[in-house]
Structures are given as structure tokens and as C-alpha cells.
Amino acid sequence: MRPETKQSKNERVIAVFGGSAPTEGSTGYEEARLVGRLLAQAGFTVMNGGYMGTMEAVSRGAKEAGGHTLGITNAAPFWRDLQPNPWIDREEKASDLLSRLRRLTLADGFLVLKGSVGTLTELALTWSLMQTQAIPRVPFVLLGSHWQRVLDVFVTNSYARPPDLAMIQVADTPEEAVELLTQGGKGR
């Protein structure tokens, strides 16, 4: 993450991408909440899109564990009526969706949860920016075996080379995901 956007030079920020649909009590929400708690306990600041669903859940988990949160919201007209979730400490308003996506790629690591088209966009953009060295190669973890099927499409169709695939790790549990991020992406 750029030094000028950090609260302190020691702040380690993990961008968490995931769906906006999960609601409190659902499996997706509660898993994201656990992820937030574990990230905060590991000393990370949690950054996300700042709104509802897994963004709210991961922020809530981090705050419940005494951690810090950063929400990158959108000032564009389509988004203007949305309020950031109540678990966000710091809000940064991007002028449009592309600026928001770019800002979300400025992190010390990435964790991708279950989501929809927006999550897939964030995953692909981050992966491409790392692959082209537009952003530094940092830990990049996908949570859940369903992501392996997505990656397999790239392998089967020769869309991604082995070095490209080596940038991404798939974790089976929130604990494993946070451990991989803590280890700097080194693991299995």
C-alpha cells in the first residue's frame, strides 16, 4: 500500500473482496466476520469496499476484535445513496468505480471470499496488475475450494502460465487464509 495512504508506516493492510449479498447469520456473512476477526488479531488493517454483505461482515469482525477498518466507497451518482457500513473507521470516497477499484488494489495483501461478478472483477484486476507488475506481488489468497474450479479454467484453456498461477494460493479455511497472509504468501 502506498505510504501516504497508511495511518502509520507499520500499518499492514489486507484488501478483502467478497459479495454484497450475504446477510447477518448466513454462512457467507459469518465466515467473513470470522475472517475479519482473525485478520485483526494478526495485526492487519482490513480494507474493503465499505458497504454491505461480506464488506460489512469482515469489518464487523475486525472491529469486534479491536482492529482497524478502511472502506473505499464510491461518490458516483449510482452509489451516492449508499452509506458505509457502521463498522468502518476510515472512509475514502473514490470519484468513480474505476478509481475505487484501483484504490482497492493498493494493499499489502489480498483475500478473496465468495462473491459474484464484482468479486470476480476484483480478483481478475488484481491478478492482472500483479502479473504485469503494475502493483507489487504480495500475498494473494482465495478462500474456498470453489475458487480452484475457476483457476482450473485458466489452466485447462492455457489462459494462464504456471508463474501466473503461482501468484495465487487457495485456502480451505479462514484460519489457513490468514496464516498464508501472515507468512507473506508462503505455504503449501
Placement of each model-derived feature along the sequence:
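Short internal beta-strands
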Residues: 45-49, 70-75, 138-145
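Acidic/glycine-enriched connector segments
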Residues: 30, 53-114
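Short glycine-rich anion-binding loops that position phosphate/pyrophosphate groups of nucleotides
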Residues: 19-22, 75-77, 115-119
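Conserved phosphate- and dinucleotide-binding cores of soluble alpha/beta proteins
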Residues: 94-167
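A charged, well-structured terminal subsegment
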Residues: 107-109, 162-188
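Glycine-rich beta-alpha loop segments
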Residues: 1-70
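Short, charged/polar "capping" segments at the starts of alpha-helices
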Residues: 24, 78-81, 147-152
